[in-house]
Amino acid sequence: MTERIRARGPRSSSVNSVPLILDIEDFKGDFSFDALFGNLVNDLLPSFLDEEADSGDGHGNIAGVDGLTNGHLRGQSAPLSSAPFFPEVDGLLSLFKDACKELVDLRKQVDGRLNTLKKEVSTQDSKHRKTLTEIEKGVDGLFESFARLDGRISSVGQTAAKIGDHLQSADAQRETASQTIDLIKYLMEFNGSPGDLMELSALFSDDSRVAEAASIAQKLRSFAEEDIGRQGASTAAGNATPGRGLEVAVANLQDYCNELENRLLSRFDAASQRRDLSTMSECAKILSQFNRGTSAMQHYVATRPMFIDVEVMNSDIRLVLGDHGSQPSPSNVARGLSALFKEITDTVRKEAATITAVFPTPNEVMAILVQRVLEQRVTGILDKILAKPSLMSPPPVQEGGLLLYLRMLAVAYERTQELAKDLRAVGCGDLDVEDLTESLFSSHKDEYPEHERASLKQLYQAKMEELRAESQQVSESSGTIGRSKGASISSSLQQISVTFVTEFVRWNEEAITRCTLFSSQPATLAANVKAIFTCLLDQVSVYITEGLERARDSLSEAAALRERFVLGTSVSRRVAAAAASAAEAAAAAGESSFKSFMVAVQRCGSSVAIVQQYFANSISRLLLPVDGAHAASCEEMSTALSKAEAAAYKGLQQCIETVMAEVDRLLSSEQKSTDYRSPDDGIASDHRPTNACIRVVAYLSRVLESAFTALEGLNKQAFLTELGNRLEKLLLTHWQKFTFNPSGGLRLKRDLNEYVGFVKSFGAPSVDEKFELLGIIANVFIVAPDSLPTLFEGSPSIRKDAQRFIQLREDYKSAKLATKLSSLWPSLS
């Protein structure tokens, strides 16, 4: 477009010398207004630019530019030239007017062409629509023609299909008729003379056509048996005439089938000896027509070496039980069974490969094989290792007892279960191998709970007999090692042993493990677990109760020993000395029996804690799935342990009696009348406790050390509270035997401080309060007679005890204290 505009508009300085001619073609393609405008004005503007450049080169800066600032001249006073500043403007205006005129003309031309094109397009569109309408009518007609053609084709096809069905039915009938004729001919041959199989067709004697002969024989036999059945039914209804049937054919066919089956089995055995799998498969396929091949499958399984070889059976026994005459252990039996069952699994896996290649229904054969393995080979070895013992006369513990049988049963059951899983993985058809395995142990599992309880009872009895034997042996040898040392050893053997209780729990835990193994149903498991745990409760209850009773017997013997040496007042000095020596021995026996009983109580608590922990960790989770089972076991546990609690309570009462008896003896023997009524009253008093107090506190500290260790919680608090109350009463009774002067009162206060300091270790507030009141009452021996009335103004509850103590004052009569106090405390007079 640029070239065309330049060609039509030659450059000229004259305004009217530019003939502009614009063409429509100039606006086609990539039109640019800037290019059009440039081509229009480039012929005029360059002359002006050239002149401006020439003027600048000749005179330097243009005066009009350099000197003009804000519309005024600067540096010159001469006026500007009168020549026009932009002379081409008139040419440009003329050029633009001509261009606009030509553009208007071009627009009119374009509008005319567009109107013409619209008319042409409208005409062509009408023709096109008319053509499309005609084409649609033609297509509709074509579709109708196709529909008629499709209907005719469908009709012809249905007719052809009917004809084909008729032809196929006719061919099948022809084939059936042909086969029926052949079958009738064969049936007549078999219906000849009874037992005569010599005149049969060659088909029945040709070894190459055995499969065909077997198929035909089965068809003939089925038909003949059905015919005989129909004749029997008609005769029973009275509608048939007697005549000859197909009895001979049935008998001959049975003989032929038996002979053919035996012949095939012989061929199958011969091929099996050669490991000719193709011949075996052919024979098995033919034999499958006889009783679905059951005889062939059973025959194959029965002829396996592991079922008929006696050496295999003997090898199994040696592998599991070891050498003849040796006592097998459960661990050795477990290893032997694992090895044996692995061998059985490998053998079955090899047989499975052969069975899959030979038999048309391998799953049925595998079911027969696995069943035979479990019922013959596995049962044979289980019968050898699981001889059920009698509960009336069980085997002795020295020979393993009932526990050996139970352990063997658990090992055999676990290994057989593993074998069942392995055989299931190898393949056993539709056989429920797990149920069959369970049936092998059904007789043992039915009586298992009774055997388990009897075993626990046998173990407990054996342990107790062992303990009694050791104690008896120590007693018999006590003369050799010394009487006291032997008695000490015997007593330690008779003490409660936490180790024994732990062993009882271990027995029970092992029994629970077996119970979980044998009991699959939650209800059965809960019932068996409860029964077995009850055995443990009975054992622990009896054991710790008997241990506590033995410890109580020692306390009773010590008490009897004390009573034996209680003497009257009028005895000789020699007898009194002997009695005192014997009393010291009785006190030592009492202290020893006290400590022994505390040890028994401590071990009893530890044993109960072990049982309770075992119940929480192992038993409760097995009982929770069954409603009421957990609560019932908790109640049984409480009932069983209540006997031990009763024995412990009685023994603790005896311990308190023992301690009080010795405290009374020490006070009676060590307390002197001068301790609280010294003749040198007024001299500096002795601030030390009395010897009796020192001995009593030392004894209590020594003997109660074991109580502090053995008892805990509420039991400890109750025991020490009772002991403190008894001690307070005993001291009150004891001090009422003496007369007190002021220095003796101070000595009594010193004793009381010792007692108060000791009983504070009990941690019993009620006891502390009683001893504090004793300290207040003891002040009656120290204050002056006139101060007695005001001594108990804040504690009126102890006035009665205080009055009894006041009567023990040395100056009670001389100071006429009875009269003074009766006037002040009339309620006490």
From Swiss-Prot:
Q: Where mainly found?
A: cytoplasm
Q: Where in the cell is it found?
A: Cytoplasm, Cytosol; Secreted, Extracellular exosome
Tell me the domain of life.
Answer: Eukaryota
Short name of one Pfam family:
Sec10_N
UniProt organism field = Arabidopsis thaliana
- Which tissues is it found in, per the record? Expressed in seedlings, roots, leaves and flowers.
Q: Which gene encodes it?
A: SEC10b
Per the database entry, which stretches of residues form a coiled coil?
244-266
This protein's UniProt keywords: Coiled coil, Cytoplasm, Exocytosis, Secreted, Transport
Q: How does it assemble?
A: The exocyst complex is composed of SEC3, SEC5, SEC6, SEC8, SEC10, EXO70A1 and EXO84B. Interacts with EXO84B. Binds to EXO70E2.
Q: What is this protein called?
A: Exocyst complex component SEC10b
Organism taxonomic ancestry: Eukaryota, Viridiplantae, Streptophyta, Embryophyta, Tracheophyta
- What does this protein do, in the record's words? Component of the exocyst complex involved in the docking of exocytic vesicles with fusion sites on the plasma membrane during regulated or polarized secretion. Involved in polarized cell growth and organ morphogenesis. During cytokinesis, involved in cell plate initiation, cell plate maturation and formation of new primary cell wall.
Q: Name one GO cellular component term.
A: membrane
InterPro entries in the record, alphabetically?
A: Sec10-like, Sec10_HB, Sec10_N
Which biological processes are named by the entry's GO terms? acceptance of pollen; exocytosis; Golgi to plasma membrane transport
The record's statement on gene disruption is: No visible phenotype, due to the redundancy with SEC10a.
Q: Family, per the entry?
A: Belongs to the SEC10 family.
